């Protein structure tokens, strides 16, 4: 299990490869959705949507991490 800071840095570093026409939040949403599959849970269950609202990126990353961490913990039991 990676730490939150490692996860956050991974996502933010990946933004260096985002398409120029994409907003940061759009990239973060798609990156997390493609790599971890939790973006729609954060968007629809938690109501945090960085796809359209870039100011929600940090909260979106934090909530995504919680879903990933909880999934990994439940896989270990």
Predicted regions and their residues:
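A short glycine/small-residue-enriched secondary-structure motif
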Residues: 67-68
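N-terminal acidic leader/helix
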Residues: 1-29
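Low-complexity intrinsically disordered segments
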Residues: 72-75
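Acidic, low-complexity, intrinsically disordered interaction modules
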Residues: 20-62
């Amino acid at each position: 299990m990676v730490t939150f800071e490692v996860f956050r840095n991974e996502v933010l570093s990946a933004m260096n490869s985002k398409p120029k026409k994409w907003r940061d939040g759009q990239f973060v949403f798609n990156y997390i959705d493609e790599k971890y599959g939790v973006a729609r849970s954060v968007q629809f269950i938690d109501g945090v949507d960085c796809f359209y609202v870039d100011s929600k990126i940090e909260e979106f990353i934090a909530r995504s991490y919680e879903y990933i961490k909880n999934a990994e913990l439940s896989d270990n039991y």
